[in-house]
């Protein structure tokens, strides 16, 4: 499956890197690399995550450290919708209703 990132997920990767870099710039780079690698690997095993229907149609979640990767698979595409800290109060309002995989 082709893996893509929503604009929100792209922005969250930058925010995560900036937050971690405040204390450890080197770790910020490696952690974001790990997140991106895990997201890329989802294309090969999209069913590995937990389905979260309360968040939106087809939304699945996979943890990475203290962060949660939210994604959706449609046809031959897998879109990373959000990457959020697990301590957040996450609900359906955090996901766009009816947003297409195209961008």
Task: Give, region by region, the residue ranges found by the protein language model.
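Basic, Lys/Arg-enriched alpha-helical interface segments
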Residues: 2-59, 93, 100-103
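Basic/aromatic recognition patch in beta-strand/loop cores that engages polyanionic ligands
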Residues: 47-77
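Enriched for short, Lys/Arg-rich terminal
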Residues: 67, 72-103
């Amino acid at each position: 499956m082709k893996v893509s990132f929503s604009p929100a997920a792209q922005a969250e990767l930058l925010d995560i890197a900036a937050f971690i870099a405040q204390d450890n710039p080197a770790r910020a780079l490696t952690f974001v690399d790990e997140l991106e690698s895990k997201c890329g690997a989802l294309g090969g095993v999209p069913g590995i995550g937990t389905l979260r229907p309360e968040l939106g149609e087809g939304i699945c979640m996979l943890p990475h450290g203290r962060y949660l990767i939210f994604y959706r698979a449609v046809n031959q595409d897998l879109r990373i919708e959000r990457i959020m800290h697990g301590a957040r109060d996450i609900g359906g309002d955090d996901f766009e209703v009816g947003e297409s995989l195209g961008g």
